[in-house]
Regions:
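Active-site neighborhoods and metal-handling regions in enzymes and metal-associated proteins
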Residues: 1-162
Length: 162
């Protein structure tokens, strides 16, 4: 599932842990997600993680003023679908962020309106495999005329916590 439910489960070797962080500064919100592996990473962990990272980087490369939220969603979703995990990308690609954590515009197949210069959005593709685990990588991005600027500075390589 994209968002965990509290439980008494203890982390086990090979668990993915999705960590969604938020911040509030002078009335403006920030949002960031990173995923780590507990213990040892398998080739499957690396495969899933790298697909999600490739999807997010494709979205960051494509995002700019004038494209629609639907187009940006499709760019990220295509990477995951082409890798064979389209059915496991079960949420929208992102959302606007600012005075609220989740605000307009939605980065989803349903938003046919163009992104405007100086919007701040999240780009957060993910893969979630029932009974196994999931990965999401999320950054806040400032939309400019011909590009977007990621605002988060946290590394994106897969971290393994031993």
């Amino acid at each position: 599932l994209p968002h965990a439910r509290p439980s008494d489960k203890e982390f086990e070797n090979g668990d993915f842990v999705v960590m969604d962080f938020g911040a509030l500064y002078n009335g403006y919100h920030a949002d960031m997600t990173r995923t780590v592996v507990i213990g040892e990473a398998s080739s499957r962990h690396e495969e899933i993680y790298n697909i999600v990272l490739e999807s997010q980087l494709a979205g960051i490369d494509e995002a700019k003023a004038g494209i629609t939220g639907a187009h940006l969603d499709q760019v990220c979703r295509k990477v995951i679908k082409d890798a064979g995990y389209g059915e496991q990308f079960i949420h929208s690609t992102g959302h606007g962020i600012g005075l609220e954590v989740h605000t307009y515009p939605r980065i989803s197949a349903f938003n046919k309106l163009p992104l405007l210069k100086n919007y701040v959005i999240t780009i957060e593709p993910g893969i979630y495999i029932a009974g196994w685990g999931g990965v999401r990588i999320e950054d806040d991005c400032l939309i400019k005329d011909n590009k977007c600027l990621p605002l988060n500075k946290s590394p994106k390589e897969m971290l393994v916590l031993k």
